[in-house]
Amino acid sequence: MKSVLVTGAAGFIGSHTVEALLDRGDFVVGLDNFERCEDPWRKRRNVAELRSHPHAERFTLCEADVRDGETVQELCQRHRFDAIVHLAALAGVRASIRHSRRYFDVNVNGSVCLLEAAKDLGVSSFVFASTSSVYGDSEVWPFAETQACDRPLSPYAASKRAVELLGAAYAHLHQLNFVALRFFTVYGPRNRPDMMAYKLLESIVHGRRVPLYDRGNLRRDWTYVKDIARGVVAAVDCQLGYQVINLGRGDAVLLKDFVSTLEQLAGGRANLCDEPAPAADMPHTHARIEKAQRLLGYAPHTDVRDGARALWHWYLTQQASAPEHGALGSVL
């Protein structure tokens, strides 16, 4: 039983991670500022689901910003956390091109505030949500953690790589156990509306036009969110100094095949337009997961069709609870 701080706790991956920690008996303090491109009610709904968890008495939410060093220090001093799970970030490769300064402020400076608190108050484990985007346009795949990651394609990827390197320094200087988890194309219930899987469902159901890059021939390692959350929880217990670990399914699926799976489940056709892939987008993502299997006991067992079915069922259910008589807000 551990005391864990989870940043970004009200978000997509964060809320599933909180549930997984509560399921195993941990005490969780969630930190979230509810400031994202998505509608705030989506995060509020995630929190409402967390408060209905059978062990919700072990969950506390603090509404604050990771860049607020004073609040972060006070939280860590009050709760004496065994671990920090840092999931809060500005996400998205294309938006980072338009707002690169803000991405570095939130993603890098916010991480430094947390690393300083971990150093000052003796937090033993720091788990950081990195991304497969750090691999850039590498033509060697599946991607292994030993590959060079020195040519990111976007400010978002560069900001995540910067925090990985900061983690290496803090682990070396302050004996911090730091695990950077490189997530691969996460999807599932509570998907954000700016993510591809959600956009495709919006297109199938509401006819909203969605670009299909490179005729759908891009490959993605679609990884179900609950498998990711289990990997994050396992990393909390990793006491091996500095580690970088891929969390994917280990299987690259053509985007057009993923579209077809959603269309079959939803009984409709997506409104797609062919466009060349943006320069910031990776042509392929595919994880080698042997290291995660060895160090974390990681075993992603949700195949793409089962995960897509769970996403579709959640999508149908959450439409009824959306504001404005089921309007789901803009797709960004």
Annotate each predicted stretch with a short phrase.
Residues 1-186, 226, 302, 310, ...:
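N-terminal Rossmann-like NAD(P)+-binding domain of SDR-like oxidoreductases, especially those catalyzing
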